[in-house]
Amino acid sequence: MNDLSHTANDALRVSVLSEALPYIQRFAGRRIVIKYGGAAMAHAELRAAVFRDIALLACVGVQPVVVHGGGPEINQWLKRLQIPAEFRDGLRVTDADTMDVVEMVLVGRVNKQIVNGLNQLGARAVGLSGSDGGLVEARPWGDGSHGLVGDVARINPDVLEPLLNKGYVPVISSVAATPSDGRAHNINADTVAGELAASLQAEKLILLTDTPGILRDRNDPESLIRKLRLSEARQLIEDEVVAGGMTPKTECCIRALAQGVAAAHILDGRVPHALLLEVFTDAGIGTMVVGRENHSSEADN
C-alpha cells in the first residue's frame, strides 16, 4: 500500500470519528436498550461485531442495556432431548419440560456467552434473568393455553439503577417468574426490551432483526421506510402494510414510545456494526419510529 492509500484511509477514519462526535456527545449518559437476537446471535462474525458495538457504546459513556432471546439454540436442545417444539400464534407453547430447557439455555448458556464476550472487550457486563431481584414480574399470557408463556406484569428498574450508574452493562434473559407462585415463564424478548426501555426512560429502544426494517412492500427490500412518527406506525398496522412477524415488533416500539421512550429503531442485525451505524452516523440504517415531533427534527438518529 502506497503513501497515498495510507493518507486516504487515515482521512476516512478521521472523517468517521468526526461524524460520530456529535452523537457521542448527545448520547453520553443516556440509556439505550438493545434487543439482541436472530442472525446477529447465530453467526460468529456478526456476534463479534455486536459485542464490539456494545462495548464501544459503554466506553464512550452511553449506558447500554441488553435483552436477549435464544430461539435457535432452544430448538437445538429440544431436538437433542427429543422434546417436541410447538408454536401457536407465533409463540412457543411451553410446558414444564420445555420451560426447563428454555431456562437452561437462556439463563445458563446464552446469557453467559454474551456476558463473557462483552467482558473480554472490557465492557463490565453483568448477567441477569428477569427473575433476579424481581426485575421483571411475569403474568400468564392470554388464557394460559400456551403453558408457561408469560407477559410483563411489572418492571422494577431499581435493580438496574446501581449497575448502570457504576458503568456496568446489564445483560438480561427474558425469563421471569410470577409473584404468586414463583414459576418461571418464557416471555418474548422484544416485549421485555420494550417495557424495560419505558421503565428506564431510555433514549432509544433498538431491536436487532433479520429484516432491513419496516418495508412499504414486504417483498421489496428497497421499500424501506427510514423514519415514522408514532401515528404513522399505528396507521401502517391498521392498513396491514405492517403484518406477520413485524407486527409485534412494531407494536412493541409503539408501546415504548407511548410510555416516554424518545425513539425506537428496527435494524437489520445481519449488517455488521448495525448498532454503531444507526447511533453514530448521519444516515443511520433501518427504520426509526419517533414519539415526539421535536425529536424527529433534532436529529436523524
From Swiss-Prot:
GO terms for molecular function: acetylglutamate kinase activity; ATP binding. Its EC number is 2.7.2.8. It is an enzyme of class 2 (transferase). Pfam families: AA_kinase (PF00696). GO terms for biological process: arginine biosynthetic process via ornithine; L-arginine biosynthetic process. Substrate binds at residues 70-71, 92, 186. The record marks 35, 249 as: Transition state stabilizer. GO terms for cellular component: cytoplasm. InterPro entries: AceGlu_kinase-like_sf, AcgluKinase_fam, ArgB, Asp/Glu/Uridylate_kinase, Glu/AcGlu_kinase, NAGK-C. Keywords: Amino-acid biosynthesis, Arginine biosynthesis, ATP-binding, Cytoplasm, Kinase, Nucleotide-binding, Transferase. It comes from the Bacteria. It catalyses: N-acetyl-L-glutamate + ATP = N-acetyl-L-glutamyl 5-phosphate + ADP. It is found in: Cytoplasm. Pathway: Amino-acid biosynthesis; L-arginine biosynthesis; N(2)-acetyl-L-ornithine from L-glutamate: step 2/4. Its main location: cytoplasm. Catalyzes the ATP-dependent phosphorylation of N-acetyl-L-glutamate. NCBIfam families: argB. Belongs to the acetylglutamate kinase family. ArgB subfamily. This is Acetylglutamate kinase. It comes from Synechococcus sp. (strain CC9902). The lineage of its organism: Bacteria, Bacillati, Cyanobacteriota, Cyanophyceae, Synechococcales.
